[in-house]
Structure formats: structure tokens, C-alpha cells
């Protein structure tokens, strides 16, 4: 472990403080940091009902992330932070698109999130019906 730490500290010592300050104050750093909201939101949406997934928007975000992954790879110097952000978003949006297609068209895999939400809905409806009946008597 100390060998890894030694290599990391050697790497940081090779570059001056001014270079790091320039990097952390540039759009090469803050652009990807701001973009991390997209994959984080998509990952959070994996636990939501698939009825709420927008197919066209998810497809647009897949295309957007694939284009900017290519851009981040080809720009000089390479922006690996931006690449990682869009790779994560591409993966999360791909999972969402898979859920959307399965839920609306294929019905191959039972979505555990949708199943759990439907069970909660049935329990609430049953409790509501029982409450209405008890008030009627």
C-alpha cells in the first residue's frame, strides 16, 4: 500500500502547484463536475417506476453522452473526467432505456421496482376500501 501512496505523491510532486491550480480553475475540470448531475440522477431513477421513463428523452441522453464521450477522448489534452462522466451516464441511460423497452414493449423481465410499487398500490387500495366499508356501516 505504501508503494502506491509513494507513486501517487511522486506524480503530484512532478507537477507544479500552478499547473494544478490552472487545472482546477478551468472548464476542463468544472465542466465534467457539473455534468455529473446527469448520471447521478439517472442512477437515482433506477429505483423509480418504469412508467415515468421517457423513451425519447432517454434516447436523446444516450446519443448526447456517446457524442461527448467521443469528444472527451479526442480533445487534446484528453479529458478523462468528462469521459468517465459520460460513460457513467451512457451506462445508466442504457439501463433506463432497457427498462423502458421491457416495460412498454417486451415484458421479458419482471421489473422488481415496478412489482414492488404495484404491491404497495394494491395494499393501499385494499386498506382504503376496507376503511370506506367500515365508515359505511
Curated annotation (Swiss-Prot):
The chain crosses the membrane at residues 20-42, 52-74. The gene is mpc-1. It is a multi-pass membrane protein. The keyword Translocase does not apply. It is found in: Mitochondrion inner membrane. GO terms for cellular component: mitochondrial inner membrane. PANTHER family: UPF0041 BRAIN PROTEIN 44-RELATED. One of its GO terms (molecular function) is pyruvate transmembrane transporter activity. Pfam families: MPC (PF03650). Its main location: mitochondrion. Belongs to the mitochondrial pyruvate carrier (MPC) (TC 2.A.105) family. This is Probable mitochondrial pyruvate carrier 1. Keywords: Membrane, Mitochondrion, Mitochondrion inner membrane, Transmembrane, Transmembrane helix, Transport. The keyword Transmembrane applies. One of its GO terms (biological process) is mitochondrial pyruvate transmembrane transport. May mediate the uptake of pyruvate into mitochondria. It comes from Caenorhabditis elegans.
Amino acid at each position: 500500500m505504501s508503494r502506491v501512496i509513494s507513486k501517487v505523491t511522486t506524480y503530484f510532486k512532478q507537477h507544479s502547484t500552478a499547473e494544478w491550480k490552472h487545472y482546477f480553475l478551468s472548464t476542463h475540470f468544472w465542466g465534467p463536475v457539473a455534468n455529473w448531475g446527469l448520471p447521478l440522477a439517472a442512477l437515482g431513477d433506477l429505483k423509480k417506476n418504469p412508467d415515468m421513463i421517457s423513451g425519447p428523452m432517454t434516447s436523446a441522453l444516450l446519443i448526447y453522452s456517446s457524442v461527448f464521450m467521443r469528444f472527451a477522448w479526442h480533445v487534446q489534452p484528453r479529458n478523462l473526467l468528462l469521459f468517465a462522466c459520460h460513460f457513467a451516464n451512457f451506462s445508466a441511460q442504457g439501463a433506463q432505456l432497457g427498462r423502458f423497452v421491457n416495460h412498454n414493449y417486451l415484458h421479458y423481465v419482471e421489473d422488481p421496482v415496478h412489482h414492488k410499487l404495484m404491491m404497495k398500490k394494491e395494499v393501499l387500495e385494499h386498506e382504503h376500501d376496507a376503511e370506506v366499508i367500515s365508515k359505511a356501516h
